[in-house]
Amino acid sequence: METQEGVSKQSIRERIWDYMESHDIADFPRPVHHRIPNFKGAAQAAGHLPHLQAFHVARTIKVNPDAPQRNARFLVLESKKTLLVPTPRLRTGLFNKITPPPGATKDILRKCATSQGVRNFSVPVGLDSSVLVDLVVVGSVAVSEKGWRIGKGEGYADLEYAMMVSMGAVHKGTPVVTIVHDCQVVDIPEALVEDHDLTVDYILTPTRVITTGCARPKPTGIMWSKVSCEMLTKIPVLRNLREREKQAGKDVTLRDEPGSQQPAPGPIRRPQDRPQTGSRGGSRSPLQGADTQLAATVCVGNLPFTTRVRELKRVLQELGVVPLRLTWQGPQHRAVLHYTDSAAAQQAASLLQGLRLGANALRVSLGQQRDM
């Protein structure tokens, strides 16, 4: 496909989505509009990955969780390399480490590479983890042979990379690969590329391996002036990073932040995307409204039957939310975490909310709840 001068990122996205649907290139899930599009031949395109020298020397590889990268995730696992997958929309952390069961067959590894497998066979990687990512694999809606990349418009891939820079997981020489259909390789005007946009070094399609030779610098960290207050609310780990950089003396002013009202670094609130009935003044987060005397405790329920206390402690350590004391209630499949204050407890609850151990989604609440 070719693009015309004067187009916008969104017009390029729409043109590619429409083209893939109308030419029967798109694959499940469909329609591909507003997604990183899956396509027929995605597995073949990913098959080029093990032939890259960057893949051979890599020990830890981050691959995005979208459908067209499923075979890439399998190939990483098959090669016995460490696979990191970003958590969807960064809700519960930055990424998870996929941990296949011992002696896993190829069929099991393929299951681990699916979205369900990512949920069932993973452990979270916290900000304090000394992880070093050697290779990054991302999806794209459009990409140019020069290495300019356009995502689906939500900015998560750009933000994921910037956050990895901030935590020291990647550096300016870390190669970035994208896997796309040939029709997604188009001319993109350089004027559309902004400083926070992630560029790519390799493009894998069903028929080609393109080395872009892109010399444009990749993001050197989080550009807080591009981050909205809404995004900060939705992504607890981003708020954690912001507090760290604020303490380091960096300018962390947000795009739409009132000059006289900077968000306090204390209690983290979950996004108000599920209104709660029976409360005054509108919707409330399920993490709000705990009794004062219980505000410094977090109850974690629905723990898998096979979970041991040391496993939960490891997860808490990786998330950077180790409590002062942990009360283990194994027969009830739950644990109570005791923190120094309500701010620490709310931060822990926010990071744990939605997390899975094995096949179980944890139930998290502030205060010692008896009915979980």
UniProtKB/Swiss-Prot annotation:
Residues 246-258 have a biased composition (Basic and acidic residues). Pfam families: 5-FTHF_cyc-lig. Residues 296-369 form the RRM domain. The keyword Cell cycle does not apply. Residues 246-289 are annotated as: Disordered. Keywords: RNA-binding. InterPro entries: FTHF_cligase, FTHF_cligase-like_sf, NagB/RpiA_transferase-like, Nucleotide-bd_a/b_plait_sf, RBD_domain_sf, RRM_dom. GO terms for molecular function: RNA binding. The keyword RNA-binding applies. This is Methenyltetrahydrofolate synthase domain-containing protein. The gene is Mthfsd.
